[in-house]
Amino acid sequence: VMNLWPGVRLRVTEGWDEDGHHSEESLHYEGRAVDITTSDRDRNKYAMLARLAVEAGF
């Protein structure tokens, strides 16, 4: 993220869910999922952000 979009930071908005906000099969209940966005919340970056996550092994 730093190299691709200088000044933009990665934001983790949720990592663990115990309140039932996700589907029953969600990995959030096991602590194995995260919801992420960028600091500028530019939705046009989301596809590339997903690609970067996959390339990083997530």
Swiss-Prot record:
Disulfide bonds: none annotated. Ca(2+) 2 binds at residues 14, 17, 19. One of its GO terms (biological process) is regulation of gene expression. InterPro entries: Hedgehog (IPR001657), Hedgehog_sig/DD-Pept_Zn-bd_sf (IPR009045), Hedgehog_Signaling (IPR050387), Hedgehog_signalling_dom (IPR000320). Pfam families: HH_signal (PF01085). The keyword Protease applies. It comes from the Eukaryota. Zn(2+) binds at residues 28, 35. The indian hedgehog protein N-product binds calcium and zinc ions; this stabilizes the protein fold and is essential for protein-protein interactions mediated by this domain. Belongs to the hedgehog family. This is Indian hedgehog protein.
